[in-house]
Amino acid sequence: MNLGTLVSETRNPQTMDLDALPTPELVKRFNEQDTLVAEAVKATLPDVARAVDAAAAALKSGGRIIYMGAGTSGRLGVLDASECPPTFGVPHGLVVGLIAGGPGALLKAVEGAEDSQQAGEDDLVALNLQEQDLVVGLAASGRTPYVIGGLRYARQSGCTTVAVSCNPDSPIAREANIAISPVVGPEALTGSTRLKSGTAQKMVLNMISTGAMVKFGKVYQNLMVDMKATNVKLVDRACRMVVEATGIGREEAETLLKQTDFEVKPAILMALTGLDAAAAREKLAAHQGFLRAALEH
């Protein structure tokens, strides 16, 4: 593949004079380019929705969401995966981020790590990949060998696969069941795909993980009711969520949360139904953790 023909590698005619611009104009040019990202992502929403449903199906069948990428793309996957346990109360390892070159590549580039298809396969083998897992390959260029190797192995293993790229009709798209390709155009700094391409990938990952967790029962209304209250700020947020979801006073909310070890869902159910903590947990379990279903039945 001639990399120079990739949209993400071409020069942007709107930013040819970056090195001659005064600072206010310099940052204005970057901002003008960033405004294009949301529209590019909007054009991919039908495919993002398919990925959300596939991610939720993986979780409901006992599988995992596995992101894999190199460089910025890999770091974004690790970032999204690492936020899921504190945000949604899921165990570490339910959403996994793999980066070419291993964890050390998060802080320092590992030269050449992305160039091996076998490394992508090996990293999935090391995770004991199962067919109920969803594998999401991330590559702004759409041609990273590490990601191609991983997606190919995942598909051969019976997994549903998703490719996220910022170039149309990319090699990784051809390896995936679902292709998400927000074409954001040439970067303000030629080839620096940590810019618009990275922003677009982050937006897509936000929707995949959050949407999947909504459909996995981790959200009530728009509240992260399975959040782990692990510090003072989050204990306060837990209390506010109970108040906002039920209309009770803060003091009563705090009393209920103490009875549930600061778990928000059973506290809300207790406030709205009069159940005690044990009965509230039992009812939630009977409805697979979906608070709305527990309240309505």
Curated annotation (Swiss-Prot):
PROSITE patterns linked to this entry: GCKR (PS01272), SIS (PS51464)
Active site residues per record: E83 (proton donor), E114
Superkingdom, taxonomy of origin: Bacteria
Catalysed conversion reaction: N-acetyl-D-muramate 6-phosphate + H2O = N-acetyl-D-glucosamine 6-phosphate + (R)-lactate
Pathway annotation: Amino-sugar metabolism; 1,6-anhydro-N-acetylmuramate degradation; Amino-sugar metabolism; N-acetylmuramate degradation; Cell wall biogenesis; peptidoglycan recycling
Induction trigger: Induced by MurNAc 6-phosphate that releases the repressor MurR from the DNA. Repressed by MurR in the absence of MurNAc 6-phosphate.
Keywords: Carbohydrate metabolism, Lyase
GO biological process terms on file: 1,6-anhydro-N-acetyl-beta-muramic acid catabolic process; amino sugar catabolic process; N-acetylmuramic acid catabolic process; peptidoglycan turnover
EC number: 4.2.1.126
Any one Pfam family match given in the protein's UniProt record, by short name: GKRP_SIS_N
InterPro entries noted in UniProt: Etherase_MurQ (IPR005488), Glucokinase_regulatory_CS (IPR005486), MURQ/GCKR (IPR040190), SIS_dom (IPR001347), SIS_dom_sf (IPR046348)
Domain annotation SIS: ranges: 55-218
One MF term in the entry's GO annotations: carbohydrate derivative binding
Sequence similarity: Belongs to the GCKR-like family. MurNAc-6-P etherase subfamily.
Subunit structure, as described in the record: Homodimer.
Record's function text: Specifically catalyzes the cleavage of the D-lactyl ether substituent of MurNAc 6-phosphate, producing GlcNAc 6-phosphate and D-lactate. Together with AnmK, is also required for the utilization of anhydro-N-acetylmuramic acid (anhMurNAc) either imported from the medium or derived from its own cell wall murein, and thus plays a role in cell wall recycling.
Other notes: A lyase-type mechanism (elimination/hydration) is suggested for the cleavage of the lactyl ether bond of MurNAc 6-phosphate, with the formation of an alpha,beta-unsaturated aldehyde intermediate with (E)-stereochemistry, followed by the syn addition of water to give product.
Name used for this protein in its record: N-acetylmuramic acid 6-phosphate etherase
Species of provenance: Salmonella schwarzengrund (strain CVM19633)
